[in-house]
């Protein structure tokens, strides 16, 4: 078993994100998890991620606050604490914190090809 204490979690930069800080909780350099990695993202008010899609699916779990997910189809969904969603590979989405409080969420993703530990 490998434990990552929050005080030991390492920061990483997520491309196309703004006014947000991320910590690696599992996978990559945080642990030997071989099937997925887990990040903790803290979005400041007004923070978010640009509309983008990726080659891998991802799961979001909101821990605190609210996160608005805008899809390229025009759909908008507001996720609250303990709400979760699955974004399929190739599905474009934007994320934003439209509130005046910090929003925190877990991100769970498989490794890109040849990137597993």
Per-region residue spans from a language model:
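A generic "binding-loop/recognition-motif" signal
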Residues: 47, 55-56, 75, 91-92, ...
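A short hydrophobic beta-strand segment most commonly corresponding to one strand
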Residues: 41, 59, 86, 101-116
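Short beta-strand His + acidic residue motifs that chelate non-heme Fe in jelly-roll/DSBH
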Residues: 49-51, 69-70, 87, 93-100
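Short acidic-glycine-tyrosine-enriched beta hairpin
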Residues: 73-89
